[in-house]
């Protein structure tokens, strides 16, 4: 999904995209350099947010925003070329916002996540394979971008990658567990859960999100993923409180004294 979000076609072809938008060659080169600077600067917060906000949450927030930026940029190409200033201003804004959103989310998260997803005994092979696959798709996407633009136009090409970002959001919501601040044992528990159970867990959690964040209700914490899976997709049964049991079964002090006096 890192490649299919469209970041590398923008990075590789930004100069030609800006030129088609209405910039001169020197202006397009300068504006392209600005996109690289934004990519660098907005990647810095990920040093902190990746372990505080979480890998999963970063992706769930940035995928819809990247999709919106690409749909917006693609739509701007429908503005007549005679309106040069608003056209190039909107194209620049859309692509700059895309890079700003990508950098703290889908930029660093996949590499961190893939390092945690593989068991220790195959982690080196897994990381090498995932990196090779990533750059293989990078070649395919960068090679096919000119043909995609010729076939579907600028609006269609940007919308194509915008649609992939929407797919990425759905995929991450239902199938991507959170791994921040987890020990190796907890990671094993999380990744031992099947995709079917994972999708069922987050399907059940949708009403909880609605009540807590939309309706602003006071709801109890939702059980952890591996606790949910260990109970066959049901909420873990609450253990009775020890004080509650003791209170129900305890003998009043007066009765204690009466029994003691009789035994004497």
Regions found by a protein language model. Name each.
Residues 1-264:
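Alpha-helical transmembrane bundle of multi-pass membrane proteins
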């Amino acid at each position: 999904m890192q490649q299919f979000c469209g970041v590398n076609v923008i990075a590789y072809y930004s100069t030609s995209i800006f030129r088609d938008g209405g910039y001169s060659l020197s202006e397009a080169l300068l504006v392209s350099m600005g996109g690289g600077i934004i990519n660098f600067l907005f990647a810095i917060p990920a040093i902190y947010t990746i372990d505080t906000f979480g890998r999963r949450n970063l992706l769930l927030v940035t995928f819809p925003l990247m999709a919106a930026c690409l749909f917006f940029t693609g739509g701007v190409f429908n503005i007549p070329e005679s309106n040069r200033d608003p056209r190039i201003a909107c194209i620049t804004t859309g692509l700059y916002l895309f890079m700003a959103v990508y950098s703290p989310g889908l930029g660093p998260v996949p590499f961190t996540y893939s390092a945690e997803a593989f068991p220790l005994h195959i982690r080196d092979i897994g990381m090498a394979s995932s990196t090779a696959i990533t750059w293989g798709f990078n070649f395919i996407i960068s090679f096919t971008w000119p043909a995609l633009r010729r076939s579907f136009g600028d609006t269609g090409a940007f919308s194509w990658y915008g649609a992939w970002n929407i797919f990425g959001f759905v995929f991450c919501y239902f199938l991507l567990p959170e791994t921040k601040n987890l020990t190796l044992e907890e990671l094993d528990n999380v990744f031992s859960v099947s995709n079917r159970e994972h999708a069922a867990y987050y399907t059940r959690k949708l009403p909880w999100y609605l009540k807590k964040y939309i309706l602003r209700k006071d709801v109890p914490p939702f059980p952890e993923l591996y606790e949910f899976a260990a109970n066959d997709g049901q909420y873990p049964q609450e253990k009775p409180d020890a004080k509650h049991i003791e209170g129900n079964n305890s003998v009043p002090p007066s009765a204690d004294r009466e029994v003691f006096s009789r035994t004497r």
